[in-house]
């Protein structure tokens, strides 16, 4: 049998997640402003290599995407974790 989860714990958890998401969105917006300013300066130089700022931003963005995907998987998994998995030998 699955365990019963407290509704209060879920609301606290969701509140914490919303706060974290808002903080990340604010940081993301600040990074975009810095990136646009850096790109304007770099366009004057016309260098062929990627700027370290751009590479760092891409790395952080990819980590953020993976973190969101894992969080989404965990939320879906927690919704359905109390439903038992039934294996069937029938084809």
Swiss-Prot record:
Main localization, broad class: membrane
GO cellular component annotations of the record: plasma membrane
Keyword match Thylakoid: no
Compartments reported by the entry? Cell membrane
Q: Which UniProt keywords apply?
A: Cell membrane, Lipoprotein, Membrane, Myristate, Palmitate
General function of this protein: Binds to type I regulatory subunits of protein kinase A and may anchor/target them to the plasma membrane.
> What family does the database annotate?
Belongs to the small membrane AKAP family.
Designated name of the protein: Small membrane A-kinase anchor protein
Q: Which organism is it from?
A: Xenopus laevis (African clawed frog)
């Amino acid at each position: 049998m699955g365990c019963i989860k407290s509704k209060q714990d879920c609301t606290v958890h969701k509140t914490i997640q919303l706060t974290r998401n808002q903080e990340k969105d604010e940081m993301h917006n600040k990074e975009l402003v810095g990136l646009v300013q850096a790109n304007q300066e770099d366009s004057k130089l016309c260098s062929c290599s990627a700027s370290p700022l751009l590479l760092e931003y891409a790395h952080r963005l990819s980590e953020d995407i993976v973190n969101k995907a894992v969080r989404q998987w965990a939320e879906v998994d927690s919704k359905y974790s109390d439903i038992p998995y039934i294996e069937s030998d029938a084809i």
